[in-house]
A protein has these predicted regions:
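A general structural signal for short secondary-structure boundary/capping elements
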Residues: 63, 79-84, 99-102, 227, ...
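Transmembrane alpha-helix interface motif
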Residues: 1-44, 48-53, 57-59, 142-152, ...
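Membrane-helix interfacial "entry" motifs
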Residues: 14, 37, 61-65, 97, ...
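Alpha-helical transmembrane segments and their helix-start/interface "positive-inside/aromatic belt" motifs
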Residues: 25, 64-74, 249
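Transmembrane helix-loop junctions in multipass membrane proteins, especially transporters and channels
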Residues: 41, 45, 60-64, 88-96, ...
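Extended cationic-aromatic binding surfaces that line active-site or macromolecule-binding grooves
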Residues: 55-59, 64, 72-76, 80
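Juxtamembrane/interface alpha-helical elements of multi-pass membrane proteins
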Residues: 70-187, 194
Length: 268
């Protein structure tokens, strides 16, 4: 399961999606999320799915990596589907104890909710897969720049988010190493019920926290050695600049959102 968590990984490439400005990709993801949450019909969901498919093909990110990253979300998907199927009022699909509690409206809501969670996850995965942590930090800091007038530590917030994303794969790899070492000493993480499995994971926490604090201390030392003192007066080697492809991508994203809002109004 740990190896299936792919959030924070970056797949280097030279595709048009990789070459987009990080600010463009961040704004495009926001437009995508708004469009997804406004999709209320099969047609609008199909439109959002088509946009996602085009982006995946254009990015050349392995589909296997995207689907593997969805495995940790399956529990949420299953729980959401069950809650919608059995607890949404409407016309029952049949008679009896089981079918009498399942409604057509519940099935429809469950399908839409599952699609929403899956497409939302894949869209956010695609952002981190095609954008390096440094570029993501620069883009986020630039977009949040106006908040500096409110004396908010924008650079520090962006740096914290970038470091958190960067260290997710590292901590997962470290956890896997610790589990492998303890399995070699006879530890059992697979058998037993949910509570027993949770108790079996407790011995992993102490070495994992020790490793995390050690890595954090090493990172802090490395940043101090490079004379890092926050964003005040800091210059950039690569200055972000919008190009024609960025304007085209944002225009297409806005057009898709406008189309979905229009279809939501006229198509049920």
């Amino acid at each position: 399961m740990l190896k299936d968590i792919t959030l924070g990984q970056f797949f280097p490439g030279n595709t048009i999606v990789h070459r987009l400005d990080p600010r463009t990709k961040l704004m495009a993801v926001i437009l995508y999320i708004v469009a997804l949450f406004n999709a209320k019909s099969p047609l609008t969901y199909a439109l959002v799915a088509a946009v996602l498919a085009v982006c995946i093909v254009a990015s050349r990110v392995p589909m296997k990596s995207l689907t593997r990253g969805l495995k940790p979300v399956y529990v949420i998907v299953a729980f959401t589907a069950v809650m919608n199927i059995f607890f949404t009022g409407g016309t029952a699909v049949g008679e009896g104890w089981l079918l009498g509690h399942i409604t057509y409206e519940g099935l429809t809501a469950a399908i839409y909710m599952v699609l929403r969670i899956v497409m939302l996850s894949m869209g956010t995965f695609l952002l981190t897969y095609t954008t390096s942590p440094i570029a993501l930090t620069d883009g986020l800091e630039n977009l949040l720049g106006p908040l500096k007038k409110l004396h908010l530590p924008v650079h520090e917030l962006a740096m914290m988010m970038s470091i958190a994303l960067r260290f997710i794969p590292t901590l997962i790899e470290e956890t896997d190493k610790i589990m492998s070492a303890q399995k070699a000493r006879g530890a059992d993480f697979e058998s037993g019920n949910l509570i027993q499995k949770a108790k079996a994971m407790l011995p992993i926490l102490v070495p994992l926290f020790v490793s995390a604090f050690r890595r954090a201390d090493e990172l802090a030392t490395a940043m101090e050695c490079r004379c890092y003192h926050g964003g005040e007066g800091r210059t950039k080697l690569h200055v972000l600049k919008y190009e024609s492809r960025d304007y085209i991508a944002l225009a297409l994203g806005a057009a898709v959102l406008a189309l979905i809002l229009t279809l939501r109004k006229f198509v049920s």
